Amino acid sequence: MVAITAALVKELRERTAAGMMECKKALVEANGDIELAIDNMRKSGQAKAAKKAGRIAAEGIILAKVSADGKFGVILELNCETDFVAKDAGFKAFGEEVINAALADKITDIDVLKAKFEEQRANLVAKIGENINIRRVAALEGDVLGTYLHGARIGVMVAATGADEELVKHIAMHIAASKPEYVKPEDVPAEVVAREHQIQLDIAIESGKPREIAEKMVEGRMRKFTGEVSLTGQNFVMDPSKTVGDLLKENNADVVNFIRFEVGEGIEKVETDFAAEVAAMSKQS
């Protein structure tokens, strides 16, 4: 039997918005498997939707640049500990230097990039007094590349064909706002589709629907699901009367790939219990 820790219950609560006792019960029934617990809670109606693991917590900036010929682009995340340092001129200048090198030398291996700038990073840490991390880097190549930065916290890069600069920029802005996970509905992995199909089928059957009717209901729900998680299936944020796919078709354009970075995705800050910290310090003194 897996121990059901407070941290596990807390994570499930954050991802489902369900009550503490419901989360603990679901984890016990799932033997500590949080993904299974979420699936079971969705089937029973306790959780209509589950958030992805990892709160947006770390600070830093996203940078994105495209080569002069417009065929190669790099997007980068540089982390620090506080919002104050994220706005620091020295921190930003370091980020510019790193992304310029990644672009010029086509460095897409994060370990290679980190090694190249380790000495400068260490010097900046000593100067600023905060830990700094070149967290991730990614690149795209294509006929038409476009980028969009929402402040410095969200960055998007899009590779397209048959599109002009303005269209690619609008698509990138849509991606920043709507967070698609795939380019087209058919790109959604079979295992993701199968898992969602089973959840929706169980929900329909448990609501009292005969299996045959439940299957037909789920077909419609699955079309909606794959559309919602894919770029071309989503309603375009600037004109919800059409999908992004419709917009691309109107312009004889296509999106080959995209990358969306948001500062701190998947990183959770350690929360300090101030009262416990004071109590611990008083015991030491």
From Swiss-Prot:
Localisation per UniProt entry: Cytoplasm
Keyword annotations: Cytoplasm, Elongation factor, Protein biosynthesis
A GO MF label: translation elongation factor activity
GO cellular component labels: cytoplasm
Family annotation (InterPro entries): EF-Ts_dimer_sf, Transl_elong_EFTs/EF1B, Transl_elong_EFTs/EF1B_dimer, Transl_elong_Ts_CS, UBA-like_sf
Function of the molecule: Associates with the EF-Tu.GDP complex and induces the exchange of GDP to GTP. It remains bound to the aminoacyl-tRNA.EF-Tu.GTP complex up to the GTP hydrolysis stage on the ribosome.
Family affiliation: Belongs to the EF-Ts family.
Name the record gives this protein: Elongation factor Ts
Name of encoding gene: tsf
